[in-house]
């Protein structure tokens, strides 16, 4: 599904070193038992399973994108699941499958919730959100501005190595999101 939107490795199978390393990421799969097919999934790694390189940096699929503070590594990572490579198969995406597509995504999120039940030490999910080049830039900028305004990481727990540059003017974004709370701005 992500390949159709411009993602993936470009190889015949989207497997990388994080799938094959000594302590690999796990897969959360949504399965349709009647049709015997996969509807969607997430790749994930428990923070308690994270290994560290010789410099003490966490070996994560997002390590090339983010700097992780010592506070994040010590206080949050042990209670975190890193998520990545989420997908809903094309046949179950809402534009093609109607309500079945919504249920596939809902079931995927239910699976994430189930992980927190079987692993009660987990309090946080972390991961990157991919917005492909085809994604409308103004829409992307609106999302990024909204998140930065209302959910800014004051402690700088996780910071981007190369911050995204907004193309939409700050004036326009401030005019769109001019309320005091995220609920009012939403």
Each model region followed by its residue ranges:
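Short amphipathic alpha-helix that is part of the acyltransferase structural core
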Residues: 1-46
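Acyl-donor binding region in acyl/amide transferases
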Residues: 49-186
């Amino acid at each position: 599904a992500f390949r159709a939107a411009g993602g993936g490795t470009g190889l015949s199978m989207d497997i990388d070193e994080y799938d094959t390393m000594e302590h690999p990421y796990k897969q959360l799969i949504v399965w349709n038992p009647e049709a015997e097919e996969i509807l969607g999934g997430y790749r994930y790694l428990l923070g308690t399973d994270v290994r560290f390189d010789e410099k003490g940096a966490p070996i994560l699929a997002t390590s090339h994108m983010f700097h992780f503070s010592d506070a994040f590594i010590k206080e949050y990572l042990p209670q975190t699941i890193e998520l990545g490579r989420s997908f809903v198969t094309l046949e179950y995406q809402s534009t093609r499958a109607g309500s079945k597509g919504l249920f596939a995504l809902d079931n995927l999120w239910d699976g994430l919730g189930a992980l927190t039940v079987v692993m009660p030490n987990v309090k946080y999910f972390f991961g990157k959100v991919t917005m492909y080049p085809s994604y409308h830039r103004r829409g992307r900028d609106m999302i990024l501005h909204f998140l930065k305004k209302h959910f800014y990481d004051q402690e700088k727990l996780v910071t981007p190595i190369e911050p995204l540059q907004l193309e939409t003017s700050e004036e326009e974004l401030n005019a769109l999101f001019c309320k005091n709370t995220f609920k009012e701005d939403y």
